[in-house]
Amino acid sequence: MFQISLDMISNKINLLGLLPEAYAPFDHIVDVLPIIPILFFLLAFVWQASVKFR
């Protein structure tokens, strides 16, 4: 019973993780999008280093 519910949850996660066919060309872009906030966070440190952490 527990295994069946785990299988159902994993199937739902897999379905939510796939883009519809119409958006297939953007699949590689979507893979990179979560990295963008990290880049802004690192940019803040570079900016502060350039102004000597005032």
From Swiss-Prot:
Q: Record keywords: Chloroplast included?
A: yes
Q: Which InterPro entries match?
A: PSII_PsbK (IPR003687), PSII_PsbK_sf (IPR037270)
Its localization reads: Plastid, Chloroplast thylakoid membrane
Which biological processes are named by the entry's GO terms? photosynthesis
What topology in the membrane does the UniProt record assign? Single-pass membrane protein
Sorted keywords for this record are:
Chloroplast, Membrane, Photosynthesis, Photosystem II, Plastid, Reaction center, Thylakoid, Transmembrane, Transmembrane helix
- The residues of the propeptide are 1-17
User: What Pfam families does this protein map onto?
Assistant: PsbK
The record lists the membrane-crossing segments as 29-49
Which GO cellular component terms, listed alphabetically, does the Swiss-Prot or TrEMBL entry include? chloroplast thylakoid membrane; photosystem II reaction center
Q: Does the keyword Transmembrane apply?
A: yes
Which NCBIfam families does this one have?
A: PRK02553.1
Q: Give the UniProt family note.
A: Belongs to the PsbK family.
Q: Which HAMAP family match?
A: PSII_PsbK (MF_00441)
- Assembly notes: PSII is composed of 1 copy each of membrane proteins PsbA, PsbB, PsbC, PsbD, PsbE, PsbF, PsbH, PsbI, PsbJ, PsbK, PsbL, PsbM, PsbT, PsbY, PsbZ, Psb30/Ycf12, at least 3 peripheral proteins of the oxygen-evolving complex and a large number of cofactors. It forms dimeric complexes.
What is known about what this protein does? One of the components of the core complex of photosystem II (PSII). PSII is a light-driven water:plastoquinone oxidoreductase that uses light energy to abstract electrons from H(2)O, generating O(2) and a proton gradient subsequently used for ATP formation. It consists of a core antenna complex that captures photons, and an electron transfer chain that converts photonic excitation into a charge separation.
Question: What is the designated name of this protein?
Answer: Photosystem II reaction center protein K
Name of the gene this protein is made from: psbK
